Amino acid sequence: MTRIAVLGVGLIGGSIGLAARRRAEGATVAGWDPDPRALERGLERGAIDERCGSVVEALDGAEICFVCAPVSQVAATARAALECGGDCVVTDVGSVKLAVLEELAGSGLPDSDLERFVGGHPLAGAEAAGVDHAREELFEGATWYLTPTERTVGLLYERLYRTLTSMGARPSAIAADVHDRLMATVSHLPHVLANVLVGQAASELVEESQGLPATGPSFRDATRVAGANPPLWRDIFVSNREAIVRELDAYAAALEAVRERLRAGDGEALERWIEDARTDRQRLLEGELAGGPVSELRVPVPNQPGIVAQIALALSEAGINIVDMALYPAPDMRSGAIALWVAGEGSAERAAELVAGLGYAASPVDGGDG
């Protein structure tokens, strides 16, 4: 029976608990939260099996720990969990990854603890916060980014990967700095812009009669996330400020280019710009929905920390989708094999070439889904 610790029983923590208890076979969930009312409600809703009075109590015997704390508190909470020892893999759910890794690396924790931390970020959520809004199916089909490092223990990474898969998520490895740049582009910048748009409209539509009824659906769609959870987004903006500022600079340059076309009355350039946006949007959506046949590869590797992370990150950076994975240690525990199932036409061949470039031999296995 797998014991899972959830530190922070809110929307995400509660949804993890519900999904794990109902989908991960044999899982029990121990919850801890600084707010006793959240624990009580989590127990009533079936999100946790046990209310714990401390992080130490929640981690007792746990195999996986989910840190579901505000971004500014993730590193401190993760450190407290890692200090409990054992072979528990500790992960988080925040949308900023590099700052957490850097803070943990500078915390004085030994490598034996740091190698048990794998940053995580599910691309799922809701506008309403709190465990009352938690849902078992929140992560169904959702990408769940994982940021393993050269320290990561392969067996612990696989344990986390399989648990997330059983909860309906699609785990995907990504480097922490790449993750933060990506989130700055597709999540954090849109939140900044939504707030700017609302502020601009509020200053322009000064009369109450010119309020929201004067706006169209485009404005409502573009500003849906404006004003969302100010303390949460304050922490996200500050923690990922370098990446967000870079994106704002690029955005300002793009706006300047549009302004120049408008000043010049260059309708043809504006039309091409809009057409390019439509093409790019379609390409991005097609990439998100891409699937294809699934093939299995076996990769013999030595039993050393970081190898699973190295391979998973290399394939992810090449755009190869790992749909499942398994580790098979040799009896002497000095070596073993990684089984990888990759999706898409030609992905198996590309994956084998990439793995070979890392110094490992990858062999296709007949009888896959594709």
Please place each PLM-identified region on the residue numbering.
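Internal alpha-helical scaffold of NAD(P)-dependent oxidoreductase catalytic cores
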Residues: L138-G227
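A conserved regulatory-domain signal marking ACT and ACT-like small-molecule sensing domains
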Residues: D280-G370
